[in-house]
UniProtKB/Swiss-Prot annotation:
Family: Belongs to the OMP decarboxylase family. Type 2 subfamily.
Protein name according to UniProt: Orotidine 5'-phosphate decarboxylase
NCBIfam families: pyrF_sub2 (TIGR02127)
Keywords (A to Z) from UniProt: Decarboxylase, Lyase, Pyrimidine biosynthesis
Pathway where this protein functions: Pyrimidine metabolism; UMP biosynthesis via de novo pathway; UMP from orotate: step 2/2
This enzyme's EC code(s): 4.1.1.23
Length: 288
């Protein structure tokens, strides 16, 4: 078995060939209802087929949120596997949004579920949380590296409830977010390993300018930036917050695309309204 190219390399290639845009896929009960679909596994499969038809091979990354599939039981998980296989068949990177976080042995099992050939999902990347300590995620990060995958850890989220915890200061004066950013950078820059960053960061697109210090601490880590569109952020916000790091950013939107459904043509149009600005945003990282 050969190890795939690192996720960071594959993302960079697709971002240039297609667009750096990441399409979130959150088939909530509300969205299924708005599309006129039943809130069951059959409606879920219909929803996913329409999204996949509309997206084709236009995006670099898709990010299905596993909870919206898990709530339909084993049939929902089967739909999730089918969706990920379909996107992988057209070369699109699959980023499974699970945000798992537990002790080391449990995290190792989670990593075996999502990463690597023969795993349940064979994801190219996944999201995690580090509330039990970054050390509990070391085997997860190593599994990701060995699989050519990436692990995105929540560092600064866009939901207001997260601020009080993420910006709390420890005895060394650093905030929780700053300490986590330092730890991710140290892992990525550990001597004797491939230079491609394995540990990425989830950084909300709606964050204030005061978070630029956290971004600087992350070094060359890839930055997954949910919050474009329905949550209020636009590409001008990305330009402001991530100036100088455009090539590291994975611009992400979900509802602002999916709410255009169920018509496939309307979904394509909504998607294109994000693809072109994402290309233009990334282009600012290259010298003219």
């Amino acid at each position: 078995m050969t190890t795939p190219q690192p996720f960071a390399h594959r993302f960079s290639q697709l971002a240039e060939q297609r667009s750096p845009f990441c399409l979130g896929i959150d088939p909530s009960r509300d969205l299924l209802t708005r599309w006129g679909l039943p809130d069951n596994a059959r409606g879920l499969r219909d929803f996913c087929e329409r999204v996949a038809d509309a997206a084709g091979s236009s995006v670099a990354v898709v990010k299905p949120q596993s909870a919206f599939f898990e709530r339909h039981g084993p049939e929902g998980l089967q739909v999730l596997q089918e969706l990920m296989r379909r996107f992988k068949s057209v070369g699109t990177l699959t980023l499974l949004d699970v945000k798992r976080g537990d002790i080391g042995s449990t995290m190792e099992a989670y990593a075996e579920t999502v990463f690597g050939e023969g795993s349940a999902y064979e994801a190219d990347a996944a999201t995690f949380t580090a509330y039990l300590g970054l050390g509990a995620l070391l085997k997860t990060l190593e599994r990701a590296r060995a699989s050519g995958a990436a692990a995105f850890l929540v560092v600064r989220s866009s939901n207001p409830e997260g601020t009080s915890l993420q910006m709390s200061r420890g005895e060394d004066g650093r905030t929780v977010a700053e300490a986590l950013a330092d730890g991710l950078r140290a892992f990525n820059e550990k001597p004797g390993q491939d230079a491609a960053p394995v540990a990425g960061a989830v950084m909300g697109a709606t964050l204030p300018d005061s978070d630029r210090g956290v971004i600087e601490r992350l070094g060359g880590a890839l930055l997954l930036t949910p919050g474009i569109g329905a949550q209020g952020a636009g590409f001008d916000d990305l330009k402001r917050l991530f100036a100088g790091r455009e090539a590291q950013v994975i611009p992400t939107a979900t509802r602002s695309v999916l709410e255009a459904g169920p018509d496939t043509a309307a979904l394509r149009q909504a998607l294109e309204r994000h693809l072109a600005p994402a290309r233009a945003f990334r282009a600012t990282a290259r010298p003219s």
